[in-house]
Structures are given as C-alpha cells and as structure tokens.
Amino acid sequence: MASVKVKFRSSTIEGKEGTIYYQIIQNRVIRQLKTDYRIFTDEWNEEENCIIVDRSERGNLLLSLQERMEWDLKRLDMIIRQLDNRKAGYTADDIVASFQSNTEGQSVFNFMQGIIARLKQMGKIRTAENYSCTLKSFMQFRGDRDVLLSEIDSDLMQLYEAYLHGKGAVRNTSSFYMRILRAVYNRALEKELMEQRNPFRHVYTGVDKTVKRAVPLSAIKRMKNLDLSLQPNLEFARDMFLFSFYTRGMSFIDMAHLKKKDLLNGFLSYRRRKTGQQLVIRWEKYMQEIVGKYPEDSLSPYLLPVLKYPFKDTHKHYRNVMSGINRNLKEIARLADISVPLSMYCARHSWASAAKGKNIPISVSSEGMGHDSEATTQIYLASLDNSVVDKANAQILRDL
C-alpha cells in the first residue's frame, strides 16, 4: 500500500514563509504533491510533522491550514484505498493525478472542506461545525466516494434525503442538512463552477413547527428555589440556566466567553459571537449573586467558571461543559416538576416568552436577545435606547 508523508520546505530567503508539500511513495517511487500552504519555520513541528497552532494573531490562519492539511491527507487515504480495492496496479503518479483531478473539477467534499476552513479562519466556529456535521453525514451516505459539484442533481438529493430518513432522521434534521448543502451549491454557482440544475426542488428544506421550549416564570421560580447545595453539578447547571435567563436569554457560548473586563460601571457589555452585534445589559443583583457564588480565579480572564484559560481546544471544552449542563438540567426539570425538555436553549425562549407575557413589544424583546433578522424578530433600530430593554428585563426579574 502506498504511503504519504507531510514535509515542510523552508524558504531560502530569511524571514520568508516556507511551503508544505506531500511525499507520496508507491513501489519505491517517490512523487511530490505541492500545496499553497505557506508558514514560517517556527510554525512547523518537525518531530510531529504538523503545524504549531498558537494564540497569536495568525492562530486562526494556522488552524485553518492545519485542518486543510488533515483533510488533504484524508482524501489521499481515500484515493489510495479506492485504488487498492480495484485489485489492479497503480503508481504514485496515479495517486497525484486522482487528487489533482478532484481539486480541479471541484469535488463536493473538497469544496465543502474549503468552506469549513475559511469559516474557522474567520472565527465562525459554530457555523463551521454545522458544515462539518453535514459533510460527515454526506460522506457516510456516499461511502466516502467523492462526487463533482457538476454531478449534484435532484436524483442524488432525493436519495440522500431517503437515506437520512432511513437512518431515523426527522424532517427538520434532513432539512438542516439540505439547507447547508444548498448553501454550498449556491456558493459554487456564484463562483461559476457549474450550471444551475435545481437539485433541491424535490426535497424538503423548510422548518416544521416543534414543541415549544419556553418555561413559564412560575417554573423558573421553582427551579431557583431548589436546594441543590449537596449536588454541586446540578447547582452549577441551574445557575448557568438562570444566568442566561437573567441576562435576557444570553446564549451559552456568549456566556462562556464573557470576560471580567466586560463588566464595568454596573453594565455588562459583550458582542454576540453568532452575529457580531454589540449588547449592553444593566447588571442586576441576581446576576451578581451567581457570579459571587463561585470563587474568583485570579489567573482566569473569564467572568464565569465555564472556561478556565484560553487554550487551543476552547470550543471543544465549551461543548463538553454545555453537554454536561444540559444533561443535568433534565434532572433539575424532574425535581422542579417541569414538563418541558429543559436545556440551556430553553432559557432564551423563556425570556422571550416572559417578555411577551408582560406585554413588552416584540421589538424590545428581540433587541434584548440580540436578534438581527428582521424577518424573524422585527428587530428594533440599532439606536434603540438600552434603558428600555433594561427596564423590561428588571420588570421580568421582579417576579422571581
């Protein structure tokens, strides 16, 4: 079986970036496959044959290059396995030619991975995760056999939808994957990589109404009054849910990344990671009660004890913590006699529901939650006075 090694060639000019390339060996014949991945010598780990991803200003770029490199290696492995399965001889040149033909012809796998890498480079980690999840599902459907963008048609999408439903996916789940694939397809159309074939016209791409996830104020009050002092994991989960509710339904990823410096002069200021919108919240006593409950770590820049220190796998750690919290919230729901399947996302819905119950205009509640889609939330003008939203929030918290 052929082998592939990652190599780095430093620049002959001091201070210039070097180039990463792949060394392919088959039957003792060596071929080189060039890439356009350029890094500095001190960004390459010679022993591990990988890029050193740090917290510098080039961190996102290096992470993107490392993941593109890992994807290339996966593609090369798939190509080699497919050639092996043919039970016919092949050369190192055949491997290189197959790799380059998919790249030049813009295969779906390769094109999507390029989008994922760019999303991560831009810091849009959650969106990149959604695209990665879709790519993984589509690759499983295809049995790791790549397909050109020009070969995407209605029949293929209908087969993929049937495959998803056969695996037990509900319509909203299959629609989630289809909408992402449609976005990928449209991006390829913009780049004029193929002609429009309307491949999604016979598959479902809508959103079915789901069970409401809002929790009434009376239930939140029961949750707040639970004595969980002997169950610290449940207490932490409850506190994170309440903090989200107190801060107008702040998303958990925004909570996790709050910095101590974001709280100043009685106001909490942060930028939504999903939309980039800047929000300012008046600091209330209930918020302080939660923050004050947990010992301050002088070495950590974060306001809440979700993330400890900035590190490479911050997002992975955040996801693990959120998973544990959501799991514990199910037990809290049982203890507080709450029938809704409780999760951190419920806090966001619950604040909006409470605002509606107080006859607070939707324009005010949508501003409070940081929505930016006029079609879904009728967002107020960006110049809306923050005091209006703070007053609405204080009105809700008084009932707890």
Put a short name on every predicted segment:
Residues 25-29, 81-167:
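Basic/aromatic-enriched alpha-helical hairpins
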